[in-house]
Amino acid sequence: MTTQRIQGRVFGEVADEYDRVRPGYPAELAADVLAYAGGPALEVGAGTGKATELFAATGVEVVATEPDPAMAAVLARRTADRPNVTVTVSAFEEYVPQRAFGLLYCAQAWHWVDKEVRWQRAAAALAPGGGLALFWNVDWPADEGVTARLLAAHERFAPHVRPNTGPIGRPIGEEAGAREWAREMGLPPEFGDLGTRLYRSGRTVSAADYVALLSTQSSYRILAEDVRENLFGTLLDTLGEQVALNVETALYLARHLP
């Protein structure tokens, strides 16, 4: 197992907190994805079910794969009343589809899937003409003073960790943006009909919940415990009572060409 994949398997340590503080995804995103490609849907790296719940609420049939047993347990509880959701405890790299899917989607996790096999596996899981939808949330403090204090604490205790301090920073919703993400992620030629969407929103959380949010991110999970405690303690002392966050959700679409 590579270092990247080890880092991608730390979320189960804080599965319940992850489910509590991680943001969901816009309802508009699910509508846009399902307008692009229909079910049945295969979800890769479902986590605790933030995206699963969104898509399941539309009535589409979802097979949700999640490699971490602790995360999958929360996912199963979250979707227990959804007969259209099947939870499978498996890494995508090891999952053997029993049928072809009209849609494969992945929220916040495609970068953890083995680069050597992920596109081949996606093509094998999709029916000809089936859609691939990859999306990520990025959030950062809306207040420059909060950002300055955030950066100062990181510089002191964890200078090698880069907190989110700004937007995604690439063209979205344009032909150039579609070409860029395909090139950046090594999308093979059997995928085409590219598209991108960007959804902007905001939310305000307590400083404690903002620190809890950071604690669910892999770059903080792998810190030494004393470093993490010093960093988070300083943030709790300096950020004030609440943190306003800007949120961007980037969606990338591709179709498995017949």
Regions found by a protein language model. Give the residues of each.
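Conserved class I S-adenosyl-L-methionine
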Residues: 1-45
